[in-house]
Amino acid sequence: MSAKAEKKPASKAPAEKKPAAKKTAPSSDGKKRTKARKETYSSYIYKVLKQTHPDTGISQKSMSILNSFVNDIFERIASEASKLAAYNKKSTISAREIQTAVRLILPGELAKHAVSEGTRAVTKYSSSTQA
């Protein structure tokens, strides 16, 4: 038997990689290290807020809650899409797996709107890369 045939799929997903926290105190050579960047969806949430309610602001606490919500939903969709790909013996998550995962996770009308917006975004991206 070859080594490739003996490989078994991992029983659980690999651990999420987190950037190492950098020090702000000066090091031995006198240079100050910068803090590790934390990636959030704050700027995107703010842009959507301004499109829908231009005269409304948002507190830091509310922004933090929405950021956690977006991360949670993305994690659920990715996890479900991963399971769907595994069930179908595929190693790649495609738009079809994402769409099915969204239909399974989001309830009723929300799923319909999410699927239509996702399809529209993929179509827009596809047409922009071909041109």
UniProtKB/Swiss-Prot annotation:
GO cellular component, one term: nucleosome
Biased composition annotated in UniProt, kind: Basic and acidic residues: 1-19
SUPFAM superfamilies: Histone-fold (SSF47113)
PTM field: Monoubiquitinated by the UBC2-BRE1 complex to form H2BK123ub1. H2BK123ub1 gives a specific tag for epigenetic transcriptional activation and is also prerequisite for H3K4me and H3K79me formation. H2BK123ub1 also modulates the formation of double-strand breaks during meiosis and is a prerequisite for DNA-damage checkpoint activation.
Protein's UniProt keywords contain Nucleus: yes
GO-annotated molecular function: DNA binding; protein heterodimerization activity; structural constituent of chromatin
Keywords, sorted A to Z: Acetylation, Chromosome, DNA-binding, Isopeptide bond, Nucleosome core, Nucleus, Phosphoprotein, Ubl conjugation
Coiled-coil ranges from the UniProt annotation: none
Cross-link for Glycyl lysine isopeptide (Lys-Gly) (interchain with G-Cter in SUMO), residue positions: 7-8, 17-18
Places the protein is found: Nucleus; Chromosome
Signal peptide: none
Record's function text: Core component of nucleosome. Nucleosomes wrap and compact DNA into chromatin, limiting DNA accessibility to the cellular machineries which require DNA as a template. Histones thereby play a central role in transcription regulation, DNA repair, DNA replication and chromosomal stability. DNA accessibility is regulated via a complex set of post-translational modifications of histones, also called histone code, and nucleosome remodeling.
Membership in a protein family: Belongs to the histone H2B family.
PANTHER family: HISTONE H2B
Name of protein: Histone H2B.2
Organism: Candida glabrata (strain ATCC 2001 / BCRC 20586 / JCM 3761 / NBRC 0622 / NRRL Y-65 / CBS 138) (Yeast)
